Regions:
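Interdomain "switch/hinge" adjacent to the Bergerat
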Residues: 1-35, 49-62, 67-317, 321-323, ...
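Short glycine-rich loop/turn motifs that provide flexible caps or phosphate-binding loops at active sites
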Residues: 37-39, 345
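Short beta-alpha junctions and helix-cap segments that line functional grooves
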Residues: 39-40, 59-60, 334, 448
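Short alpha-helical Gxxx[C/S/T] motif in the catalytic ATP-binding
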Residues: 40, 44, 64
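Solvent-exposed, flexible loop/coil residues
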Residues: 41, 91, 95, 359, ...
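Short glycine/serine/proline-enriched coil/turn segments at secondary-structure junctions
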Residues: 44-46, 81, 453-455
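Conserved GHKL (Bergerat-fold) ATPase module
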Residues: 187-204, 215-501
């Protein structure tokens, strides 16, 4: 059994129901939300457990932690209202059900034991997710291994592949491109990473895809259709409220509890539709602007000197990681002797109007556009390799010397660098530290600081702990490392310097 608790604001009952309803999305018209359909709560859970219990006071969840069981229950607590929702794949499989309407719920445990679960949500609001009937592998062991005290790892992990594929803690650290929340795993804080702050020689390239105009037009058409649908729903809810008021005009409905509740529900339905109409119209206006002037994609590239075996393209969708360390052709070639583009990490945040993620957030729907994106990243990565000129005039030996200076003495590319103080200091002196404040959650860039290099970043690091007094205090704006912006032209390349936004 796996438990996940969120101590933030809780879900209202209606929102909680929509969270566990298949095919339902409240985020489609909100471009700022992470992911088009959320973070993969339902699809991730069904790939991992048989039951899920969800106790909520409000919930943020990563599907990376949910692909482990078939069942869950969600408990929510907010404004004195306790809600418990169950989703069971076991039940569906047992009776070969394609769809089911739950009219009543049979709780196998006593109510005292059930309400004890809500006590685990210590604050006034929050959410508790309980996964059980965890999946097992062929040997009978659980798919997830809980032997490590502060981590959850795959039981059949592969030593030579990236740590983020084996470790939930490592995966959560890069799950969001710009994390602004606190995540704890097994009682210990996850030190989230703003990946652009961990790379050497970060370069930024703007790319306008051939299909970007077409995608923008399609997105605008979808938004227009949504506006029409919402207007029709608003007309229907307004009509229902008008009919109610006409029917009971002249009567004192305030003395009738049933009529009062019906009136409130009808008024709320109209109010909700008015809010959705405003939201849809704003989204349509934004889509119109994007249609007339499509925003180019932004590619970032850098060298991962801390872990050179973790390289490839990190593909995000609205700030949420979809695929990691995807090797493009220039990195797949048998170029171990040339070492061309090995150790290079590419980062792109793709809006769903261009590429929609699958429901489990592990891939993209349109394979043709996906492959087109990878080809573009491959071309830009080759240009990046030329721009940084890592080898200099020495060729492959120059690349080998570069890596040797940072402690990579082994010719085996999958091996880690030496942890000798001399080389560790070199790596941190070139990059510094990008740290998130434990209070305000802003990100700070700290130049090389010996205690952090030797002892690591304190778990509860705050802005007041900044070695540079200029940046002490949560009121200070975020200070991020610089990035080289490469402006392409048919005849020349311009490189400028700007801080990462």
């Amino acid at each position: 059994m796996v438990n996940m608790v969120d101590f933030y604001r809780s879900l209202m009952m209606g929102v909680a129901i929509s969270v566990v309803s298949f095919g339902h999305s409240l985020k489609r018209m909100e471009p700022g939300m992470i992911g088009q359909y959320g973070n993969g709560l339902k699809s991730g859970q069904l790939a991992s457990s048989l039951y899920m219990f969800m106790f909520t006071n409000e919930f943020l969840v990563s599907s990376g932690a949910m692909r482990i069981a078939k069942d869950f229950i969600m408990f929510t607590k907010k404004d004195g209202l306790l809600t418990c929702l169950l989703l069971s794949r076991t039940f569906h499989e047992m009776y070969s059900l394609k769809e089911v309407s739950v009219l009543s719920i049979l709780v196998t445990c006593c109510f005292d034991a059930l309400f004890e679960q809500f006590e685990r949500i210590s604050g006034a609001s929050g959410t508790l997710i309980v996964l059980f009937n965890l999946r097992r592998i062929e040997t009978g062991d659980f798919e997830l291994n809980f032997d490590a005290p502060y981590d959850v790892r795959l039981s059949n992990f592969e030593e030579q592949r990236e740590e983020e594929r084996n470790s939930l803690r490592a995966y959560l650290s890069v799950l969001y491109l710009k994390p602004h929340m606190k995540v704890y795993l097994r009682g210990k804080k996850v030190l989230t990473t703003r990946i652009l702050g961990t790379l050497l020689y970060p370069y930024k390239y703007n790319y306008t895809a051939k299909n970007m105009k077409t995608c923008a037009i399609k997105e605008f058409e979808r938004c227009e259709q949504k506006v029409r649908e919402v207007n029709e729903m608003l007309r229907m809810t307004s009509s229902a409220l008008g009919e109610f008021e006409a029917k009971y005009r002249g009567q004192n409905i305030h003395t009738n509890k049933t009529l009062r509740m019906e009136q409130r529900l009808l008024a709320k339905a109209r109010s909700d539709m008015e809010a959705k109409k405003d939201q849809a119209e704003k989204r349509a206006a934004s889509a119109m602007k994007a249609k007339n002037n499509p925003t180019p994609l932004t590619f970032y590239f850098g060298i991962n000197i801390h872990h050179r075996n973790r390289y490839g393209c990190m593909l995000y969708n609205n700030g949420r990681l979809i695929e990691m360390y995807v090797k493009v052709p220039v990195q797949k070639e048998k170029n171990d002797l040339l070492m061309k583009c090995l150790g290079v990490v590419g980062v792109v945040d793709v809006p769903y109007s261009i590429l929609e993620p699958t429901h489990n957030k592990q891939s993209f729907e349109n394979k043709r556009e996906y492959l087109s994106l990878l080809r573009a990243m491959n071309d830009h990565m080759e240009q990046y390799w030329k721009d940084i000129n890592l080898a200099g005039s020495e060729g492959p030996s120059g690349v080998k010397t570069f890596w040797k200076n940072f402690g990579y003495e082994n010719s085996d590319w999958s091996s880690e660098c030496t942890n000798l103080a001399e080389y560790r200091k070199k790596r941190y002196m070139r990059i510094g530290h990008t740290i998130q404040c434990d209070k305000c959650l802003k990100w700070r860039h700290v130049e090389y600081h010996a205690p952090y290099e030797i002892n690591g970043i304190p778990e509860n690091w705050c802005c007041n702990d900044h070695p540079n007094s200029i940046f002490r205090g949560c009121s200070k704006p975020e200070e991020m490392p610089k990035v080289h912006i490469v402006l392409f032209s048919q005849f020349y390349i311009i490189v400028v310097h700007k801080k990462i936004e």
